[in-house]
Curated annotation (Swiss-Prot):
Name of this chain's protein: Small ribosomal subunit protein uS3
Coiled coil: none
GO terms under cellular component: cytosolic small ribosomal subunit
Organism: Anaeromyxobacter sp. (strain K)
Self-association and partners: Part of the 30S ribosomal subunit. Forms a tight complex with proteins S10 and S14.
Pfam families to which the protein is assigned, alphabetical: KH_2, Ribosomal_S3_C
A Gene Ontology biological process term: translation
The keyword Ribonucleoprotein belongs to this UniProt entry's keyword annotation: yes
Residue ranges of every copy of the KH type-2 domain listed in the record: 38-106
Gene3D superfamilies: 3.30.300.20, Ribosomal protein S3, C-terminal domain (3.30.1140.32)
């Protein structure tokens, strides 16, 4: 039986980069667990800020955390007070000097993680799952997505038996490496159990840099 590989992991090193950018031999395990703690803390502290992804860069004794958010105002706070508080709390989780950078997500409607979280929030508010899914599909296409697939699984609508439902519009080629496919997952915690929400968004095609460099340049004129 065929299984679906993670679309982001499948494209790492081809058209997508890693979310943790550092190299270490001796302290690898320590830094890895540190990264997990830092990410969990930021997501917990800024749950309402619409966090898309968190990038962590390390160099010497410094840690740079790039928070991609749809609502940068919530993260920064009044006159930057919010960002300073979070930075101080993050400093307690690591021995290295912390730098916090906020990156605004311009189109939240075409960000898979934010779309998945939006669907999960609607399900928690008892909005009909089909309505929430269809609305997300239409909105993503309206804002320039080439294709989108949305799937929900669990006790949908409070039914006794769990099931899996999905909708797709446009192109979502999961095995085309040059296809820029974003993937997001969120869980809706409802009174009748958890419902998993998965979103795949095709944002277009990207030619890998290495392939672009190898491609021969075409010039006018006949061959010698």
């Amino acid at each position: 039986m065929g299984q679906k590989v993670h679309p982001i992991g499948f494209r790492l090193g081809v058209i997508r980069s890693w979310d943790s950018k550092w190299y270490e031999e001796k302290n690898y395990a320590k830094w890895l667990h540190e990264d997990i703690k830092l990410r969990e803390f930021v997501k917990e502290k800024l749950g309402q800020a619409g966090i898309s992804r968190i990038e962590i860069e390390r160099a010497a004794n410094k840690v740079k955390i790039n928070v991609h958010t749809a609502r940068p105002g919530i993260v920064i706070g009044k006159r930057g007070a919010g960002i300073e508080t979070i930075k101080k709390d993050l400093q307690g989780l690591t021995d290295n000097e912390v730098y916090l950078n906020v990156v605004e997500v311009r189109k939240a409607e075409t960000d898979a993680q934010l779309v998945a979280e939006n669907i999960a929030t609607q399900l928690e508010r008892r909005i009909a799952f089909r309505r929430a899914m269809k609305k997300s599909v239409q909105t993503a296409l309206k804002f320039g997505a080439k294709g989108i697939r949305v799937a929900c699984s669990g006790r949908l609508g409070g039914s006794e038996m769990a099931r899996y439902e999905w909708y797709r519009e446009g192109r979502v080629p999961l095995h085309t490496l040059r296809a820029d496919i974003d993937y997001g997952f969120a869980e809706a915690k409802t009174t009748y159990g958890k419902i998993g929400c998965k979103v795949w968004i095709m944002r277009g095609e990207v030619l890998p840099q290495s392939a672009a460099a190898r491609a021969p340049r075409t010039t006018g004129g006949a061959r010698p």
